[in-house]
Amino acid sequence: MFSNKDLRKLIIPLVIEQLLAVTIGMVDTVMVSSCGEAAVSGISLVDSINFLLITLFSSLATGGAVIASQYIGRGDHKSASLAAKQLFYASLALSAVLGVIAVFFRKPVLNMVFGSIEADVMAHAQIYFLLSAISYPFLAVYNAGAALFRSMGDSRTTMLISILMNTINIVGNAILIYGFQMAAAGAATASLVSRAVGAIIITVLLLNPRRIIFYDKLHKPEIHLSMLKSILQIGVPNGLENSIFQIGKILVASIVSGFGTISITANAVAGNLASLQVIPGMALGMAMITVVGQCIGAKDYEAVKKYTKKLMLITYGVVWAMTLLMLLFSKQILSFYSLSEETTTMTMEVFIVHGICAVIVWPLAFALPNALRAANDVRFTMIVSLLSMWIFRIGFSYILAIYFNMGILGTWIAMCIDWFCRGACFVIRFARGKWKNISFIDN
């Protein structure tokens, strides 16, 4: 079904797109770092909440992408387009509701999650949260559109849009942060504008009826409950899984926030570097949805095994390469941040721990489960993620970071323990082949 050329055309733009997506967060942090560590800390704390909400949009988009991919594999393009339209409406509705809630309750949420943090950190966090919330609908619509393009095997279009969005973001940061000294507000405004532009462009492109999947008469709402149910069968468990994952990260961030501004900043910078480190793996995981989803639609289970193994080998190769490269140039990379010596040392310490664990188990913990999701085996991945997160990541974070007084290093070691547990579970599940029994959704 997919030649090596087809896989390259799908994967390479995805890697570039994911690199650019993570760059937005890194550029924000690097540029705001010139305004002081309080601004960096404020953005970091809000982003832990943002990621929780944004992951819901991504999960819904994944549900739509899986259904669309399966219909494409079956050759039913009309149903694929119908699924796309339902995904658009659902994404817009969910993001609008969450955006309104975040705008009006941002201060109580910040106080509830992070408790008493320094006043200047809270000031930056509040304005960043407000502007981020306004951008939620744009981001949700863009995520939905990007997922649909990937379902068609067209990741080049989303890559080009991502390049434009990042250009807008970087230029906006330069003007608002350096020119107008807007700090966190400037970073959030630039991101808001870039997301709005991306959402508009990708929606317009999907109105073209010549595409395999397109938005048919978007101005005339039509809700097909059976189709929406199929999307939600994937999106809801995936959303719960990812939400639990982000809630766990927020709880860990609340532990880190108790160690002071230096620890918060080190955790934020190390988090940015860690995201960059696994970008190729994230891209391969996204490609897994498209490839396996279409194989599932065609009911070709041998192809599922073949392409999953092939993509996993590629994932391991690129994660190893990226990790070695970043460790070799870690000092040069950290020099872009305006960090104190103590913060730099702490950042480097946890980044090394992450690198060692990433090359061993990250692909099994985060790329392989996408093959299960593409086969609709989302309940299993949700249950494993829920148990692993709460038992290992959160439980061991309290034990290592607080009881054994290891600080943020303890939270990162706990994260690695979580990875090993979930990775083992996903390997066993895929090998046993139970996903074949729930692999196709028929309306």
Q: What is each model feature region?
A:
Residues 18-19, 55, 95, 99, ...:
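Residue-level hotspots within the lipid-embedded alpha helices of multi-pass solute transporters
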Residues 1-14, 68-135, 179-236, 292-358, ...:
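Short alpha-helical transmembrane segments in multi-pass integral membrane proteins
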Residues 9-25, 131, 194-198, 202, ...:
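Transmembrane helical elements of multi-pass membrane transporters/channels
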Residues 40-100, 139-158, 253, 264-330, ...:
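Small-residue-rich hydrophobic transmembrane alpha-helices
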Residues 2-30, 34-35, 51-63, 67, ...:
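N-terminal transmembrane alpha-helices
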